[in-house]
Amino acid sequence: MSAESHPTLPPVRLHSDAELARDALGAPLFARAVRLARWAGPATRVGVGGELVADQLPAAAAHLGLDAGDEDAAGYASQAWRVAVDTGLVDVAEPEEDADAEGPGEAGEEPHGTAAPGEDLALVTAGAPGDVLGLWRAALETVLADAAVPDLEDLVDALDEGGEIDFDRLDWNPGREADFLDEVLANLYLLTVAEGGTADRQIPLPVLAASMVVPDGMGEPTDAVLEQVSDAMMRLDDQFRQLEPIGLVDFRPVDEELMAQADEDAPRGDLAADEEDVSRYGMVRLTPLGLYGIRARMLEAGVDAPAVGELAGKGADALLDAVSSYPEHAAQVEIEQWMAGREPADAVAELLSAARGDDEGGPLRRLRCQQALALAGPEAEPAVRSVLDEAELGGLARVWLAEHGAADVPAPAPEMVFWLTVDTIAAQLAADGETEELPLLMETLTAHHTGFFDQVWRVEHPSTVQVLEAMGRLHPDRKRAKEARRAAFKARSRRP
C-alpha cells in the first residue's frame, strides 16, 4: 500500500495496548504457535527451512488438542509451527547441507535439524503489551504472505511434465498478489474508519470486491465487470478464511450453495448482483486487533493514518490543522480529548490564537475552533472577550458570548457581519462541499440583511469570490442567486 494512493484518512479509535495484547494472545493461530514453541525440545526434528518433519506433525497436532481424525489437523499444526519459527518463538538449527543421511538419524533417514524455544517466547508472559503486539505483527506478516499464495489445486494444475511449477500457466506474480491483498485491506480499513473509526462495522464481501474492480465513476457495471467482481469475491473468500485465525478479521464466508451455483451454470455476474440476502455473499469485519495491525502497516508504508487521542499532547495549531480534515464526529471526539487535559481558559486562548490566519485553511480552522469553544464554560469568557475587536475572531467571539448569556456584548459592525458570513460559508464548503443543507444556511445568513449582495463583494476575505460563486449556484431564491452572481463578478474585478 502506497502513501500516494491513500490521502489522510479519518482517525481510528484503537483499544489500549493491553487490550490488544490480550486479543493477540487469544488469536487461535498465535495461541497455537505459542503452545508449540513451549512444546519444542531436544526430540523435535526439523527439515530444511525449519519445518517440522512429517512424522512429528501428528504429535504436534495432538499437543494442540486437534482432532486426530481431522484431515486438516496436520496442516493446522504445520502452519502454527511456521508462525512460531518466523516470529522467533522457536529457534531452529537446520540440517547441515553436507550432512550424511546416516548422520543424525538411523540409516536411510533424511538429515534433520533441531529446535528449541526461542528467546522471544519469554516476551509472551514477561514482556510489555508492545512486545506481544510486535510478535503478533510478525505472525501477521507470515499469514499475509501465505494468503497471497495460490491454493493447492491451482498449484497442481500448473505442474509441468517434469513436476515443476509452470509459473506462466499459473499466472501468479508474488508482488502483484501481495499488492492486491494490501489494497484489499487498505480499502477495508477505509470503509471501517469512514463510519466512526471503530471495529463494529461489517462490510459485505461484494462491496469490498467491487471497490477493487469497478472503475471510479462507472454507473451500471457491465457483465464483464460483474464477472470480475465475482472472481474477486471468490479470491477474497479464500484469503479471509486464512486471515481469520490470526485475529485480523471476523469473517462470514460465502454461502456454500452460492459457491456451488458459481461452479455450475449460474451466470457469474448474478453472484454479485443478487441483493436478496447480502450476508449470504460473505461479510467481513476488521477486529480491534485488525484495525491496529492494518494501521501499523499503513504507517510503515508512509500513509497518514491518524488515531483518536494522539493529538492530546500537541498544541492547538496542530489540533486545528489536523481536525480540519476529519469528519465532524471524529473532530468532536479528538477535540474533547484535547480539551480534557487542559485548563479551560488557557485552552481557549491557545485555540483562538491558532484559529487566526487568512490562508486557505483559515475558515475551517475557525469552524473547528468554534466547535471546541462550545465545550468551554464561563471561565473562558475573558479569553473570548479579548478578541472582540479582531476582524477574524470578533464574530465568533460574539456568537459564543451570546450563547452563554454574557452581558455587555457590543453589536458587530456591518463589515464584521459580512466577513463572518463569508467565513462561515467558506468553512462549510471546505468541510462538506455543496451539501443539501448549504442552500438553507445561505438563505438564513442573508435573509436579514437588506442589500447584502450590494455590500458583501467588498469584503476583504480570501474566499469572497468562491463563496459568492457558490451562492450564485445554490441560493434557493432565484433573485438572490442572480444578485450573488453579479456580486461575484464585482469581487473578481477587484482582484489584481
Feature annotation, model-predicted:
Residues M1-V225:
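Short, amphipathic alpha-helical interface elements at domain boundaries
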Residues E71-D86, Q228-D255:
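Short amphipathic alpha-helical interaction segments
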Residues F167-N187, V193, T198, I203-A210, ...:
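Exposed, interaction-prone assembly regions rather than primary DNA-binding/catalytic cores
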Residues A210-V213, D321-S325, A331-R342, S353, ...:
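Structural detector for internal amphipathic alpha-helices that build alpha-solenoid repeat scaffolds
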Residues F240-Q242, A316-D317, P344-R356, G377-L388, ...:
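Amphipathic alpha-helical scaffolding segments comprising HEAT/armadillo-like alpha-solenoid repeats
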Residues Q242, L248-G309:
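C-terminal engagement modules used by replication, chromatin/transcription, nuclear envelope/ESCRT
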Residues S325-H329, E360-P363, A391-G395, T446, ...:
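Alpha-helix N-cap/helix-start positions at coil->helix boundaries
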Residues Q337-M339, V399-L445, G451-F452:
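Alpha-helical adaptor scaffolds
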